[in-house]
Amino acid sequence: MQFFVYSAVAAGFGIAIAAFGCGIGQGMAVRGAVEGIARNPEASGKVTVTMLIGLAMIESLSIYALVVSLILIYANPVSTAMQGFVGLGK
């Protein structure tokens, strides 16, 4: 039973760390884009497109962390093996 509690806690910490890291990364990316547009307003179109592609890549990392967390909680492939290992299996 403790294994499932640890899985839920690990999933929570994993998504929290991923969200924190992605938020910091997105903030730094937007800051850099705004500074670049402030220095060269004519390049705002290219900078904006590049920034949006970068933000999508950063956000994909957060989505991957969410998928891994959901797998840890709901579809853990080693749950039956771990139940047998800790003595909860039949």
Swiss-Prot record:
Q: Which UniProt keywords apply?
A: ATP synthesis, Cell inner membrane, Cell membrane, CF(0), Hydrogen ion transport, Ion transport, Lipid-binding, Membrane, Transmembrane, Transmembrane helix, Transport
Compartment list: Cell inner membrane
Q: What domain of life is recorded for the organism?
A: Bacteria
Q: Where is this site: Reversibly protonated during proton transport?
A: E59
- In Pfam terms, one family for this protein is ATP-synt_C
> How does this protein sit in the membrane?
Multi-pass membrane protein
Query: What are the GO cellular component annotations?
Result: plasma membrane; proton-transporting ATP synthase complex; proton-transporting two-sector ATPase complex, proton-transporting domain
Q: Tell me where the transmembrane regions lie.
A: 4-24, 53-73
Annotated PROSITE patterns: ATPASE_C
Assign the protein's first listed, main location to one coarse class.
Answer: membrane
Which cystines does this chain contain? none
GO MF, one example: proton-transporting ATP synthase activity, rotational mechanism
Under Gene3D superfamilies, the record lists: lithium bound rotor ring of v- atpase
Quaternary structure and interacting proteins, as annotated: F-type ATPases have 2 components, F(1) - the catalytic core - and F(0) - the membrane proton channel. F(1) has five subunits: alpha(3), beta(3), gamma(1), delta(1), epsilon(1). F(0) has three main subunits: a(1), b(2) and c(10-14). The alpha and beta chains form an alternating ring which encloses part of the gamma chain. F(1) is attached to F(0) by a central stalk formed by the gamma and epsilon chains, while a peripheral stalk is formed by the delta and b chains.
The family this protein is said to belong to: Belongs to the ATPase C chain family.
Q: What does this protein do?
A: F(1)F(0) ATP synthase produces ATP from ADP in the presence of a proton or sodium gradient. F-type ATPases consist of two structural domains, F(1) containing the extramembraneous catalytic core and F(0) containing the membrane proton channel, linked together by a central stalk and a peripheral stalk. During catalysis, ATP synthesis in the catalytic domain of F(1) is coupled via a rotary mechanism of the central stalk subunits to proton translocation.
Protein's UniProt name: ATP synthase subunit c
Q: What is the lineage of its organism?
A: Bacteria, Pseudomonadati, Thermodesulfobacteriota, Syntrophobacteria, Syntrophobacterales
